């Protein structure tokens, strides 16, 4: 379980100094219908003949690398950058901090 705080003081390239940054998890955008590969694939698929390209079924990884999106909180900067961290099964953003000697409650 990886727990990351919602704010982080780190270097901002635009401000050229350390600033507080808002942390969110990166999400992939929707695929464009007009990308060259998608247009070619759709053209090939149309008409008779069934599936024309192999469907990938041999997945090797069980997790994805977590990518953090850091946004500078300076009102007239707001520059954004990505920061990749290691692979993990469970990722949490701004969860409760772990305390020493605390009894686990269920």
From Swiss-Prot:
Principal localization reads cytoplasm
Q: Which UniProt keywords apply?
A: Cytoplasm, Ribonucleoprotein, Ribosomal protein
Q: Where in the cell is it found?
A: Cytoplasm
UniProt KW S-adenosyl-L-methionine keyword: no
- In terms of superkingdom, the source organism counts as Eukaryota
BP-aspect Gene Ontology terms: chordate embryonic development; regulation of cell cycle; translation
Q: Which cysteines are joined by disulfide bonds?
A: none
The answer, when asked if Iron-sulfur is one of the entry's keywords, is no
Choose one Gene Ontology CC annotation of this protein and give it.
cytosolic large ribosomal subunit
**Region Disordered: what ranges?**
26-53
What GO molecular functions are on record for this protein?
structural constituent of ribosome
What does the UniProt record say this protein does?
Answer: Component of the large ribosomal subunit. The ribosome is a large ribonucleoprotein complex responsible for the synthesis of proteins in the cell.
Give the PANTHER family listed for this entry.
Answer: 60S RIBOSOMAL PROTEIN L36A/L44
> What family is it from?
Belongs to the eukaryotic ribosomal protein eL42 family.
Q: How does it assemble?
A: Component of the large ribosomal subunit.
Name used for this protein in its record: Large ribosomal subunit protein eL42
Q: Organism source for this protein? A: Danio rerio
